[in-house]
């Protein structure tokens, strides 16, 4: 069997249902997907969507907004490719850090470290996900994470 090509492409407005379906299958929230101030990507294998990831942009930092690969495509390093492509995009746009909320995952292996919730809420206060939590007077579940980006050296 030949390996099908994998491509990560910028999500378009018509991809919202696809992104939401992939996120829902992974148990992730779909609120604010593809809103203004965000960038999303769809991963395709053989022309079929198998993953999605998003970034919500703040001033000099971004919030990772979902990283999901369909169960049928897991265990092949595709999730790592998605995350690292988002890290590279954030670095290239000049972000000093990427933050995220997570209920699981081995985020240390991606260079993330746990940080207090106040750090994330304070550094990316205008991102859709943070605004939504504040509007509901709700704390995000799980842990809060940060990955510093060495923009000056061109390394993420």
Where are these regions (language model features)?
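Short amphipathic alpha-helix that is part of the acyltransferase structural core
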Residues: 1-32, 138-156
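Short, hydrophobic beta-strand segments that form beta-sheet elements in well-ordered domains
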Residues: 23, 40, 97-100
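Short, P/G- and charge-enriched loop/turn segments at secondary-structure junctions
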Residues: 29-30, 128-136
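Short, small/polar residue-rich loop motifs at catalytic or cofactor-binding pockets
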Residues: 35-37
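Conserved beta-strand in the GNAT
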Residues: 42, 48-56, 61-68
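Conserved acetyl-CoA-binding loop-helix of GNAT-fold acetyltransferases
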Residues: 69, 75-88, 99-100
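Conserved active-site alpha-helix within GNAT-family acetyltransferase domains
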Residues: 92, 96, 102-129
């Amino acid at each position: 069997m030949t390996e099908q090509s994998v491509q990560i492409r910028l999500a378009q407005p018509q991809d919202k249902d696809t992104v939401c379906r992939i996120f829902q299958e992974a148990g992730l929230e779909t609120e604010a997907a593809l809103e203004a101030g965000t960038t999303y990507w769809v991963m395709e294998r053989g022309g079929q969507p198998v993953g999605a990831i998003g970034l919500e942009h703040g001033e000099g930092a971004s919030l990772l907004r979902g990283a999901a690969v369909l169960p049928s495509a897991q265990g092949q390093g595709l999730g790592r490719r998605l995350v690292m492509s988002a890290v590279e995009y954030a670095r290239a746009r000049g972000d000093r850090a990427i933050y995220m909320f997570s209920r699981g995952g081995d985020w240390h292996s991606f260079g993330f470290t746990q940080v207090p919730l106040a750090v994330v809420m304070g550094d990316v206060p205008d991102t859709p996900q943070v605004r939504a939590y504040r509007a509901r007077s709700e704390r995000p579940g799980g842990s809060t994470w940060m990955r510093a980006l060495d923009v000056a050296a061109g390394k993420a």
